[in-house]
Each structure stands twice: as C-alpha cells, then as structure tokens.
C-alpha cells in the first residue's frame, strides 16, 4: 500500500505560539526527544543563528514525520510581516495548513493576512486556538472572535479541562475521549474515563458532538437523515461528513489547547491526517519543481524540491542528489516519491519555480502571484513574479571593507536575492550597492547572514526611506548622442506623467519597424533601469511614460552604449525641479495592556499618526492608526520603552502621499 502524503504549513501572528506548536507536533510524532523552547533558542525548526537570537522564524523550516501510516512534510512559516514572501513560497508547496490563533490576543493583524493568503491560494485550513493553559483566557471569546473577524464558523474538535487553575486534560469531540499526560509527557487516552459515566464535562462534550453533527449534516445526506430521525450518528460517519465540511469556505475545524504544555496536539495531528487533502497527481514526465532556495554555511546552496515522479536513485539524472532536510542537516535517501519534498543539489544553478524534467533539463513555467498570495496556476512562484508583490520600503548603502572582496560580496548578494524575492540589490557604478528591503528586521538579518554565512566584511550605512518620485508635468523632448570610435547612438526622448504607478515606453513607428529585436529590447531595458534609482536618488521613479521619438544606431553598437546613451538622455530630460516626492503611509496595528494605552496612543499622535480605530476588552487596548513611515522609523525601540516591552504591533503599507 502506498503511504499517503500530507504537505502542511503552519501560520500565525507573531507570538501566537506557532513554533512552540511545531515543536510539540514533532515531539508527539517521535521526531525529537523533547520539544525545543523558542525562548531558550532551542527550537528545532528555527535553526538559523538569527532565529535563535531573535526568537522568531525567518526562513520556512521543513520537517518530516510519520503519523499512523501518513507521511507529513511540515513547514513552519515566519509570522513577521518582513518575511511575507517566505509564507507565499511555502503555500506553493502545500495543500493544507494550520492557522494558530492566540486565546490571549485573539485574531490579530497577521492572523487575518495569513488567513486571506490561505483562502486565495486555495489551501485547506484547520484552526488551533493556543495558550489555553491560562484559564483566564476564554475559549468561547476566541471562537466568537474567529467568527466575527475571519468570517467562518469554527467547529470545535477539542477543548481544555482545568484543575486547580491549570490545564489538566483535553476532551476530544470526535472520539468522545479524554486525553491526559503520561509519565513521559506524551498525550494518551485516559482509560478510566467514559463519556457516559456522568463526569462534569460529559455534557459539554456531548453538546459539541451534537453541534458537529448538525454542521456536518449540511454536507452529508446520511447524517442529515439520521439527525432528522433523532438517531445517533456514529463517529466514522461523522468523520466522513466533517471531511466535506472542512473543504467548504463557511466552516473551519478548530482544535484548542496549549502548545506550551502539550495539550490538544495529538488530536490536532490526527485531524491533519483525517481532514486535509493528499497531494495531487502530477505530470510523470516531470521530475519535479524547485519551491525554495537555501544556503548553509559549510554546505553551500541547495534547492527545496517537490518531486512529481517516483524515481529510485539509479534512475536519477546525472549530477543530481536528493536528501531529507532536517533543520540544517542533509540526510541521504535512496528514492524520491511524487508529492514529497526533498533537498536537491544539481550540477547547475536553479531558480524558484523551475520545473526539471526526468532527463535533468529545465523548464521555467510562466506562473504568477498576486500580492495576497493567490496562485494563477498550480506552479510554484518564480522570483521575477513574486518580486512584483512586495514593495521595498527601505534602502541601505553597503560597501566592502576591502576592495579585494568585491567579487565575493557581489556573488553573496546575488545568492541572497535569489533566495528571497522581496529583497533587491541595486548596483552602483561607484563600487557599492543599495540593499532594498521590506523592513528593518529583514535588513538586519541579511547583514548578519552576509557576515556569518558568507564571511563578507561590509560597511552598511543608515537605512533610508524609499520614497516614490513622480513627474510634476509633461517634459519637452531632448536629444542625446553617445559615441565611441565609429559607433554612435542617438536618441530623442520626451516624458509625461501617468495616473498609475506603472511605466510605459512608447517607441516611434519608424523605430519599431526598422530596429532589430535586440535593439528594441535594449532601449526598453535601459529606460526602465533609469527608473529604479529615480532622479533624486530617494526611490523609484513611477507613473512615467517615456516616448522615444527618434533613435539611430550604427552596426556593432554594444548594449552598454545603449544603456549609457539612454541614461544620459534621462538625466538631460528630467531635472530635480520636475519631481514631486511621495512618502509611504503605513497602517499601524497595535495592542498593549490598558495601563499603557494613553502613553502609546499619545506617542503615535505626536509622530503625526491619525488613530482611526480603537478596541479592546478592558484588559488589552488595541488601535489602528495611519502614520508616515518616516515618523516611525525605528519605532520598535520607542514603543518597547514606553510599554515596558508589553506592546505588540505590525505595519502594513497603505499607499503613498505627496510630501509637503
């Protein structure tokens, strides 16, 4: 019998307990001897030095385990907004997911963002309400919050039992059983407990079973008939109905417990096996697809690879090697199975989304993604498409300590930019680089990795806000000529503003008709490249239409000459006075204890923020505000000081506003 495969991702807001739950899952499955603690830097899934130091997930860690004859590939994704591209790439490789909701904080900003990504990507999702080790946190309130904010009806599968103010067991709705801890800390069924023996929580367990039957009856006629006739529905039949329910958009199966104390985890894993889909069928002509790139010190670059074929080692293409990836360790395998995930080393440099056919040659699929993570095909995203989904908000100048290291730093930055589509590198003719990042955390991590993993000694300037530059008016044509020896290039160029953020390049009919394809492509590429740095150097030039009214060239003109001629023409054409700066405006979502609410809110207002939404429950204060990014640059340190480290916040780009 072929062992079924489940590819699962786990998502959450920062500090909801996602990695702690991942560790508990691995412990329950027997993959680790004890669950590693995030706060001690011992989490198995967070293997990078930066992850251990910061206590956050940066790269999507992959683990493998077996549970009751089902093989799981388990991907722990980052919760921090700076690493949203990691989440998008993880979702390209899975069919199911666990979304963790903290009972302490409820549905938070990144919870909503993650849920939206899951829905638009078509990934079936199971919820886990965490942090119920504290009886002061209400499961009922969390369920109401889920329904109100996420718009799905949670169907409860487990709930906690308390004794002396501590969680002591969980009740499993489907199996009608009670799970407690054994002497080794594992969850086991309590054989001394029976739901029909009149225990205090028996009535509540039966109530949730009846609710599950009621919800499942909307998807299963057999269950509906038994329910109408007033007959009991056996667990196996309910299981079948809940499988159909789990595939709907109206409901979400919900497990509840405490990852920290290891309650509710065993039932959750069984639920992942029961209710999440198996891997789909693939084209057997394909060996598989690159879904992620990784770099390890001492190992070098590897590709995370999703196999599309079953193939034994003797049939692997020449030069290819496949392994299991456990944190940063490579474990050899003797065969690959369709749908399974492996680490791959190949004789050539790979790119995200590349499909490799069985003979070892490459096809690069034309897939694309939206900013919300929606797949327009079943293929993993290519870096070139995913880059368009993330807007870098910071730019930082970096240069070598020693000029002899230039080539090494250049190669290292190339590897990092290929690994992370949201990170971009801009080369300057002066011998330095600008690093374009989504946020400060991403920048700090990249600089640390350059030093630790690649051995690069660089000097980094202070990060600056990336503004948008826009034309104020239509600009009359200019002419420019560039000549080296007998080779000459001339261009006549004008520019006008567009209402959108797009770039448009219009070529004269004569030029289009007479120029060869490589010349046309070279001109387009050269003009687009000038928009990356802008005129003032503050950020990209957007919303512009270049019109090439005339273009002449001599045979033998090289691409660098075209680039130089076009760049000089743009410099002639657009002056600083022609530019209006637009600054990024962020939506700040923050929560803190109520006793810090006044200080935190006052600080945001002093930074030019406009509070637009206030909430909370009398214990936790929440609010949303629109604030210019330049006013909250380095905000993490300030809010940590004001709130004594108790505030949590996230930022989302709303758009750009003209600077006064």
Where are these regions (language model features)?
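Structural and coupling elements of P-loop NTPases
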Residues: 1-660
């Amino acid at each position: 019998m072929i062992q079924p495969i489940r590819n699962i991702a786990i998502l959450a807001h920062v500090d909801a307990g996602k990695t702690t739950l991942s560790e508990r899952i691995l412990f329950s499955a027997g993959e680790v001897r004890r669950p590693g603690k995030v706060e001690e830097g011992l989490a198995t899934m967070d293997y990078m030095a930066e992850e251990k130091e910061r206590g956050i997930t940066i790269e999507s860690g992959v683990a493998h385990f077996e549970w009751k004859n089902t093989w799981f590939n388990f991907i722990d994704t980052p919760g921090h907004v700076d690493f949203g591209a990691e989440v998008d790439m993880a979702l390209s490789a899975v069919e199911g997911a666990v979304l963790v909701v903290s009972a302490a904080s409820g549905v938070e900003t990144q919870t909503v963002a993650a849920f939206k990504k899951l829905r638009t990507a078509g990934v079936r999702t199971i919820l886990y309400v965490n942090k119920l080790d504290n009886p002061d946190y209400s499961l009922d309130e969390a369920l109401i919050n889920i329904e109100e904010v996420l718009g799905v009806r949670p169907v409860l599968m487990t709930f906690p039992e308390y004794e002396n103010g501590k969680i002591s067991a969980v009740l499993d709705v489907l199996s009608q059983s009670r799970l407690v801890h054994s002497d080794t800390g594992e969850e086991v069924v309590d054989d001394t407990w029976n739901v029909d023996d009149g225990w205090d929580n028996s009535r509540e367990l039966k109530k949730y079973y009846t609710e599950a039957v009621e919800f499942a009856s909307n998807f299963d006629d057999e269950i509906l008939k038994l329910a109408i006739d007033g007959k009991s529905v056996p667990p196996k039949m309910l299981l079948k109905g809940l499988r159909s329910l789990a595939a709907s958009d109206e409901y979400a199966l919900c497990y509840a417990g405490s990852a920290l104390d290891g309650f509710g985890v065993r039932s959750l894993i069984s639920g992942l096996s029961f209710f999440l889909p198996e891997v789909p069928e693939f084209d057997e002509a394909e060996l598989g697809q690159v879904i992620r790139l990784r770099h390890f010190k001492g190992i070098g670059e590897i590709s995370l690879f999703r196999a599309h074929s079953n193939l034994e080692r003797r049939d692997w293409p020449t030069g290819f090697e496949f392994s299991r990836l456990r944190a940063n360790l490579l474990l050899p395998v003797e065969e690959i199975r369709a749908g399974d995930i492996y680490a791959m080393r190949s004789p050539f440099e790979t790119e995200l989304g590349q499909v490799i056919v069985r003979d070892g040659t490459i096809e690069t699929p034309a897939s694309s993604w939206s900013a919300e993570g929606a797949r327009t095909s079943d293929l993993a995203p290519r870096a070139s498409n995913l880059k368009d989904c993330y807007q870098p908000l910071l730019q930082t100048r970096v240069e070598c300590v020693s000029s002899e290291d230039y080539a090494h730093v250049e190669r290292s930055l190339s590897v990092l930019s290929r690994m992370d589509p949201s990170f971009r590198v801009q080369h300057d003719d002066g011998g330095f680089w600008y690093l374009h990042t989504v946020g400060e955390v991403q920048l700090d991590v990249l600089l640390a990795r350059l030093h630790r993993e690649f051995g690069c000694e660089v000097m980094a300037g202070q990060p600056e806000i990336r503004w948008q530059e826009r034309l104020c008016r239509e600009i009359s044509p200019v002419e420019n000529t560039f000549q080296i020896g007998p080779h000459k290039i001339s261009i006549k160029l004008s520019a006008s503003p567009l209402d959108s953020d797009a770039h448009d390049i219009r070529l004269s009919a004569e030029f289009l008709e007479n120029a060869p394809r490589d010349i046309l492509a070279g001109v387009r590429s050269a003009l687009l490249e000038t928009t990356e740095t802008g005129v003032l150097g503050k950020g990209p030039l957007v919303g512009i239409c270049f019109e090439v009214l005339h273009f002449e060239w001599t045979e033998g003109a090289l691409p660098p000459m075209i680039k130089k001629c076009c760049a000089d023409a743009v410099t002639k054409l657009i002056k600083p006075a022609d530019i209006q700066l637009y600054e990024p405006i962020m939506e700040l979502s923050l929560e803190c204890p109520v006793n810090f609410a006044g200080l935190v809110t006052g600080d945001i207002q002093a930074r030019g923020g406009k509070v637009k939404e206030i909430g909370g429950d009398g214990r936790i204060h929440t609010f949303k505000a629109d604030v210019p990014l330049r006013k909250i640059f380095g905000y993490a340190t300030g809010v940590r000081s004001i709130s004594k480290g108790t505030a949590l916040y996230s930022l989302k780009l709303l758009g750009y506003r003209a600077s006064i």
